[in-house]
């Protein structure tokens, strides 16, 4: 039977040589350029500068979308153009991909990150629509 284990029953395991050492994988630093533009306000009253600032604060999240796919396709570069509809409460109601020179994974990831941003409430109480270009390339 499986009775209690006394301390005398436990034996140490000896690790010798390199068994306990993990090999460090070299990480290659890739410089990435991401052009940050001002949003093009299409409809409604929303401060373009405030919108641009909210998007810039999430720059790393957008870059991560590109970096992940760059590992699979080293020559990946291009533009993702989004049309964003912001509701009267400042939440994103919809994000459409108007143009995508990259691949579907980057486009969908960028759209998803944009959808999660809270924007200022549009003046006048209506929804606001703007377009925003993301241009990615290796630097």
Tell where the protein language model's regions lie, with residue ranges.
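Short, positively biased Gly/Pro-containing turn/loop motifs at secondary-structure boundaries
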Residues: 44-49, 60, 64-76, 104-139
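Short tight loops/turns at secondary-structure junctions
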Residues: 14, 26-44, 62, 72-102, ...
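A generic structural signal for short, solvent-exposed coil/turn residues
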Residues: 4-7, 22, 26, 74, ...
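Generic structural detector for well-ordered beta-strands
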Residues: 54, 83-85, 96, 133-137
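Intrinsic-disorder/low-complexity signature in envelope-associated proteins
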Residues: 1-56, 139
